[in-house]
Amino acid sequence: MFECRIDGQFFKKLFETLKDICTEVNLECDENGIKMQSMDCSHVSLVDLNIVSDFFQHYRCDKNCVLGISINFMLKILSVIKEKSTVFLFKEDNENDAVLNIGIIDEEEQSSADDSLEIQVKLINAQKEHLEIPQSEYHCQCTMKSKKFQEFTKYLNSIGDNVSISMKKDAMILSTTGSDIKVTKQFTNDMTDISITCTKSVSQEFATRYLVMFSRASSLSDEVLISLSPHIPISIKFNFKQQLTDLQDPSHLTFFLAPKIGDY
């Protein structure tokens, strides 16, 4: 049997973050938690999700299972989520039973789980290759507030289609060029809430629209870790905090984006 309970707002925001990158996902569930990997249709970006069992309000998985889910369909279900809603997921071990049971309860309006909204969803067979993410040691890393990252990527996207990201000792520089305009922004270690480490100067160019899509995860995490090295995809990682404490959790949502070589 598989069952879990998770904060409704978090669960809804997670699928809202993914909706323009993936159409279908396989949530791989085992005793340690839920994992998911997926590529966008252009095969230039990769999503890596890991939610460990301790992050959930309740988690149980007696037998490994895969939940094939349509993102848009799940968002329709989660549209009733309110600020203090809780989501329950339940699935029997029977392999022939391709149904996910979902319960949604609003803690402010309902007194018990017996009053929850009950939904049954037929799982899909999301055809996904299992992807191996190579372990890379990045030369440069920058930690900053995720909201600041989101605000500036949106601004860059309004100016140009591509953004150059450069890192050197104590600084990260983002720049883009539009019609008769060039915008450059430098983030340095002496700025509030910025931490940069760099062992080798690196500069690469990326499609701005992907950074905007990734930045939607700012609703899930206060900080973002940007990692850069030559000739490999940039890593943009959002770590989740445990819901009842301020401690960082191994749970995360990480995006990888290939540098611009041609058009994509």
Swiss-Prot record:
GO BP term, example: regulation of DNA replication
InterPro entries per UniProt: DNA_clamp_sf, Pr_cel_nuc_antig, Pr_cel_nuc_antig_C, Pr_cel_nuc_antig_CS, Pr_cel_nuc_antig_N
Localization, UniProt: Nucleus; Chromosome; Cytoplasm
Keywords in alphabetical order: Chromosome, Cytoplasm, DNA-binding, Nucleus
Superkingdom field: Eukaryota
A Pfam match: PCNA_N
Gene3D superfamilies from the UniProt entry: 3.70.10.10
GO cellular component: chromosome; cytoplasm; nucleus; PCNA complex
Induction pattern: Induced by DNA damage (at protein level).
GO molecular function: DNA binding; DNA polymerase processivity factor activity
Record note on quaternary structure: Homotrimer. Oligomer. Interacts with ORC1 (via PIP-box motif). Interacts with FEN1.
UniProt similarity note: Belongs to the PCNA family.
Role played: May be involved in DNA damage response. Appears not to be involved in DNA replication in trophozoites.
Name of this protein: Proliferating cell nuclear antigen 2
Gene for this chain: PCNA2
